[in-house]
Regions:
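Conserved ABC ATPase "signature" region
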Residues: 38-47, 104-105, 146, 153-170
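Short coil-to-helix segment of the ABC ATPase nucleotide-binding domain corresponding to the Q-loop/switch region
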Residues: 135-142
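Conserved ABC ATPase signature
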Residues: 175-179, 183
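ABC ATPase "signature
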Residues: 260-261, 269, 337
Length: 360
């Protein structure tokens, strides 16, 4: 597979849900709850704003987020991404719906229970770093631990492990103003990890960084995830970033999920023209994997790993007799075959799909 994109094991999507969101609505305004039925009956976001002065933030969100996986939520500006992630720890209260974590109802929690939930079950990384300017790197990273009740000295000592994990060893006594933007975001990530919360919420965490630094932060996150196995909800507007780090992706538009699935499903089976337009500029040869275009049966051709990119597979298929290869899993077992024609066909998008409202 081409360097830079993550190998997605289809089996990962079978993990039990850590977090469940059901029939979630958010309407901003003094009487938001009174317009739920109107939204269910089809009133548009623009009509709700023009005629009633209320803003539709989320529209019937249903999403199961698997344990220990990275769930990407993406969409254009104003699609509801940040609104959705802030419902998980109730920084925003919903107008209607259900949110459960480990089958515990988040919306029924008392203020005391919610405070404990935020301290111990979730941690958050923001786009704007949100570091305390008067505290050192070590003190910033230790901050969440002190909130949990750790003595400051003990918390600071524990912080060194996480500072080292994000590559900032030696910068413990520096202040945020003495760090670059990328280094500051590493501190933010270390602070979130230090609390050992099982759920990590990342709201456009890398969006403000330069491309090279952004890629570096993605690498750090993926390397840490191999060991930590967090349940991560990752917000982005960047498709390349979503494809690179996500086990699953949900794409929002006007507060509604238009499509959800693993990266291969999103690319190979876009739900409508809106999604098709969203993915039109990706390099399909680098992103689509052989397993997405393989067929039943066997072949005497050279074996190709199921996660091999089409770009790499085409070079081999073109030189094989009958232009076909066998496909093997990560244990070397044959699981199907792939042909040159199938690989070439997958490089081209379908020209006409189900029309979204934007294209009607």
């Amino acid at each position: 597979m081409a360097k830079g994109f993550r190998l997605i094991d289809m089996g990962k999507n079978m993990s039990k849900p850590k977090l469940k969101i059901k029939n979630l609505y958010k309407i901003f305004g003094p009487k938001g709850e009174t317009f739920i039925e109107s939204v269910k009956n089809g009133i548009s976001k623009q009509e709700l704003l023009d005629n009633h002065g209320h803003v539709l933030g989320l529209n019937d969100i249903n999403l199961d987020i698997p344990e220990q996986r990275i769930q990407v939520i993406m969409g254009l500006s104003g699609s509801g991404k940040s609104t959705l992630i802030r419902h998980i720890n109730r920084l925003i209260e919903p107008s209607a719906g259900e949110i459960t974590v480990d089958d515990e109802d988040v919306l029924s929690m008392s203020q005391l229970q919610l405070r404990e939930f935020r301290r111990k079950k979730t941690s958050m990384v923001f786009q704007k770093f949100a570091l305390l300017p008067h505290k050192t790197v070590a003190q910033n990273v230790a901050y969440g631990l002190t909130i949990q009740g750790e003595q400051e000295g003990v918390a600071k000592e524990k912080s060194h492990k996480w500072i080292d994990s994000v590559g900032l060893s030696g910068f413990e006594e520096r202040y945020p103003s003495q760090l670059s933007g990328g280094m500051q975001q590493r501190v933010g990530l270390a602070r979130a990890l230090a609390t050992d919360a099982p759920i990590l919420l990342m709201d456009e965490a890398f969006s403000a960084l330069d491309p090279l630094i952004r890629t570096d932060m993605q690498n750090i996150l993926l390397d840490l995830q191999k060991d930590l196995h967090k349940t991560i909800v990752f917000i982005t507007h960047d498709l390349d970033e979503a494809l690179r780090i996500g086990d699953n992706i949900a794409i929002l538009r006007d507060g509604k999920i238009i499509q959800k699935g693993n990266p291969q499903e999103i690319i190979m089976k876009p739900a409508d023209d809106y999604i098709s337009d969203f993915i039109k500029d990706i390099n399909r040869g680098k992103v689509i994997e052989v397993k997405s275009v393989m067929q039943k049966g066997t072949s005497k051709g050279a074996p190709l790993d199921s996660s091999c990119s089409l770009e790499d597979a085409l070079k081999i298929l073109n030189n094989e007799k009958n232009n076909e290869c066998s496909v093997i899993d990560d244990k070397g077992k044959k699981i199907g075959k792939v042909t040159l024609d199938a690989a070439i066909s997958a490089l081209f998008r379908e020209k006409s799909l189900k029309k979204s409202e934007k294209y009607k």
